[in-house]
Amino acid sequence: MQFTLGMYGEGDFFSMKGVVEEFFEKIGMHKKETYDPNAGKTFLHPGRQANIIYDGKVVGYLGEVHPEVADTYGIGTRAYVAVIDMPEVVELATFDRKYEGIAKYPAVTRDISMVVPKEILVGQIEEVIEKKGGAYLESYKLFDLYEGAQIKAGFKSVAYSIVFRAKDKTLEEADVSAAMKKILGALEEMGIELRQ
């Protein structure tokens, strides 16, 4: 049994990805999912599709409907779909409900934009953010992924928003800078260039 989501109009690939991540969070799948861009679905745009991987298992896929398919069905705008394999997801879900109070201290957000070799997956970048982000790392979100004429051949542009927060104090610039230095250093070691 599959659960299928669709959107068109104002949404984009990242909007659909956000919907999937929110769905997983609501059913107690709290580990970070990763995305493999080699979903191989012919009805999806070849450069805008990915398998959804959770806890090492492919649990679905998402992407932009191929323009030719959209034209065939009279869809005059970009359309996006996510298909989730419910038997796999039900095995992984905990359906737990936890109350979290309102955060007492403010968050600090840093955005990073990178030029990344095409063979490096966003999941590898996210592993670095998680490992090097330190105790104050609260969350991160991919907000831009671009391959095109303005980016040199063999590379893609990737951008993340990274959020830091302490539970017991207001973070100082030095706290955030130290974490960002570790993240950026590890990314540069992978051959990733930071965009200014």
Task: Identify what each model region corresponds to.
Residues M1-T4, E10-Q196:
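A carboxyl-terminal module marker
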